[in-house]
Amino acid sequence: MNVFNTASDEDIKKGLASDVYFERTISAIGDKCNDLRVAMEATVSGPLDTWINFTGLDEVLKLLEGLDVDLYAIPEGTILFPRDANGLPVPFIRVEGRYCDFGMYETAILGFICQASGISTKASKVRLAAGDSPFFSFGIRRMHPAISPMIDRSAYIGGADGVSGILGAKLIDQDPVGTMPHALSIMLGDEEAWKLTLENTKNGQKSVLLIDTYMDEKFAAIKIAEMFDKVDYIRLDTPSSRRGNFEALIREVRWELALRGRSDIKIMVSGGLDENTVKKLREAGAEAFGVGTSISSAKPFDFAMDIVEVNGKPETKRGKMSGRKNVLRCTSCHRIEVVPANVQEKTCICGGSMQNLLVKYLSHGKRTSEYPRPKEIRSRSMKELEYFKDIS
């Protein structure tokens, strides 16, 4: 039995983290398993009014690797709407093989991509709001610690410049990012806490001093400017009961620092931020952001997985589109069209070339290529995001 209330890797691999009706269905099929080869596709049921930064595929591949299945998917870090130009559902993943070999993993597959994609998409929206200013993912404390690496990885792919989690940072091959906690000021007092923080800031790290524990933020900022010659950031994590007009407070602090010739000290803000508040605070003068709950607890996308073909024949349930499909995207205008799987490319209505986004990642359970590292996936994501700057 696991110590914490989580499924182990082995539990997931055994299909124990699945809805029981999949297990019962496979048991009921029995000897007919060998004769039932299917193609299943994962599409989004909602929300449909926003684009999605597709994330979580890495874990799907780890789960299905070694099984006799073929898997096609849109690459992680690809950003697109869940419906094509004609209103058809976009298949993000297609798995082909014997149903009894992989059907019990439907729950896990959906869980991997629903939550990770929700987090990375929210991070991408914060990325757009922050502009060129850095923002960091500080939200793992709001979710179960067992999934903290997944949260940090997804936030990083979505656009976070760094993450606070030790395991999450290791997963993305980055150094974890942190400032100083209120606890340090409470235990030692502000001045001693600030000195200790600066003394322990390593070369290459940015020094960040928290200024809202006991003092008025303006006077704390002035005090720091007078006490220290080199400080990279002051951080305002002002609680909502004291915050008032946060934009006005930031402008006030910014003014006082500039008046004293300390425009070199930048302002970082945190506490209850999302893409809407980040945009307003950036316009007010904030230059870095710590974003937590809105990213780590982002609403998951409602992916669903459905059989679309049985033994080579198009078959599916009511409300779904039967048959294996490809997803074509125009290299010029980014128009998306869902087409039958035998169509690999076509000319777009704009005259550009439409190419298939689906990539074959597993062939009979074996990897077809080396999987990209998180940094490479993030790079793809940031290039994709350029197209969505003016699209809500």
Swiss-Prot record:
CDD domains: NAPRTase_B (cd01571). GO terms for biological process: NAD biosynthetic process. It comes from the Archaea. Keywords: Ligase, Metal-binding, Nucleotide-binding, Phosphoprotein, Pyridine nucleotide biosynthesis, Transferase, Zinc. Zn(2+) 1 binds at residues 330, 333, 350. Its EC number is 6.3.4.21. Zn(2+) 2 binds at residues 330, 348, 350. It catalyses: nicotinate + 5-phospho-alpha-D-ribose 1-diphosphate + ATP + H2O = nicotinate beta-D-ribonucleotide + ADP + phosphate + diphosphate. Nicotinate binds at residues 21, 138, 179, 235. Transiently phosphorylated on a His residue during the reaction cycle. Phosphorylation strongly increases the affinity for substrates and increases the rate of nicotinate D-ribonucleotide production. Dephosphorylation regenerates the low-affinity form of the enzyme, leading to product release. It is an enzyme of class 6 (ligase). Consists of three domains, an N-terminal domain, a central functional domain, and a unique C-terminal domain containing a zinc knuckle-like motif containing 4 cysteines. PANTHER family: NICOTINATE PHOSPHORIBOSYLTRANSFERASE, NICOTINATE-NUCLEOTIDE PYROPHOSPHORYLASE. This is Putative nicotinate phosphoribosyltransferase.
